[in-house]
């Protein structure tokens, strides 16, 4: 099991499973709308492919036209990592809570 999957907290993953009705892969446009509303879908894809946003994009087929999405475990891991970074930043500014 990779470290990324191990870092995912069960509550985050379970909440996302409930939010997306148990889907394994969430369409990229939905992820964009729900979590990256300040970006267009195209800009989100570019940032992910460049590595600016560490979120793996899944294509079900090798075709360039295949639908793109984000695996639920990857999304949960990304959210948990962003939360951990925010907590570290807060603790540096305000001291541990």
List the predicted regions and their residue ranges.
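Helix N-cap / beta->alpha transition motif
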Residues: 27-28, 56, 71-74
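Polyanion-binding surface elements
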Residues: 12-43, 78
């Amino acid at each position: 099991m990779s470290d990324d999957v191990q870092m995912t907290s069960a509550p985050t993953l379970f909440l996302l499973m409930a939010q997306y009705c148990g889907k394994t892969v969430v369409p990229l446009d939905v992820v964009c709308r729900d979590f990256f509303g300040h970006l267009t879908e195209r800009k989100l894809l570019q940032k992910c492919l460049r590595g600016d946003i560490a979120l793996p994009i899944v294509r079900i087929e090798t075709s360039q036209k295949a639908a793109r999405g984000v695996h639920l475990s990857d999304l949960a891991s990304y959210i948990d990592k962003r939360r951990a970074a925010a907590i570290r930043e807060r603790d540096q500014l305000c001291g541990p809570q």
